[in-house]
Regions:
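ATP/nucleotide-binding catalytic cores
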Residues: 1-246
Length: 246
């Protein structure tokens, strides 16, 4: 029996094949039952046009299903990280999924598709140089992401890319209590700028921050109405059993 693929967030596509036609007007399409509830909340928030920046917090380190139950029960590879799920399912048809954390630096996320990975890497190389020079420093990395998003805005519409950004360990990018330092304040202001930029909400851009504990993230991000904070809960008994059988 073939696995059921989750509808991807696809603002430029057909609602029947993805989650709507535009960030502002598309109706939300129901995700399959096997998809996490937090994913449906993220999709609904994006498609409503109220936000393009999201903060996933809580149980963001557990493996999550990235295939239908029939497949996941027999294949451990049908489970992946939250970042895997975002790259393969939520943004599986987007042109670029760019991830960053302070440990691994900037990198494209393309799931298991090598052709998609090469295409992403080539496009990113044209924008920010050879992969060997991509910044690991958080200030430089956030500045590079900002430059990518700004360049995408001024590109002709037919050349614009659908870009998703996944910022893991967000508590180290915008930590609570550290906005007094110049570098931390700069990163915070850039992220807030993405959330409140009406132009970004009109093109195909989504930024997802992952944090283990919401209290460790700067309150300016947590409390901003333009940022959708979504809790990722601990798995229930049925989910734990499903994983144990994989």
């Amino acid at each position: 029996m073939p696995s059921v693929q989750a509808p991807r967030l696809e603002p430029g596509g057909d609602p029947a094949g993805g989650l709507g036609t535009s960030a502002a007007t598309a109706p939300a399409a129901a995700l399959p039952e096997w998809c996490p509830a937090w994913a449906e909340r993220l999709g609904d928030a994006y498609l409503s046009g109220t936000s393009c920046v999201f903060l996933l917090h809580g149980n963001v380190r557990d493996l999550v299903p990235i295939a239908a139950p029939a497949a996941a029960a027999a294949d451990p590879a049908a489970w992946g990280t939250v970042s895997d799920f975002l790259a393969r399912e939520m943004f599986g048809r987007w042109d670029v999924v760019l991830a960053y954390d302070v440990g691994k630096g900037l990198r494209p996320l393309a799931g298991p598709d090598p052709n998609r990975l090469r295409t992403m890497a080539q496009w990113l190389t044209e924008r920010i140089g050879n992969a060997a020079t991509w910044p690991r420093d958080p200030d430089q990395a956030v500045a590079a992401i900002d430059a990518i998003l700004e360049r995408n805005l001024i590109d002709p519409p037919e050349q614009r890319k659908r870009i998703a950004v996944v910022l893991d360990y967000a508590q180290y990018l915008a930590p609570a209590g550290e906005a007094g330092s110049r570098s931390a304040a700069s990163r915070l202001v850039r992220i807030l700028g993405w959330a409140t930029n009406p132009l970004l909400r009109r093109v195909n851009v989504a930024v997802v921050l992952l944090a283990d504990t919401i209290s460790e993230v700067h309150p300016r991000l947590v409390q901003n109405p333009a940022i959708s904070a979504i809790e990722v809960p601990m798995p229930d008994a049925a989910e734990r059993e499903r994983f144990a059988l994989a």
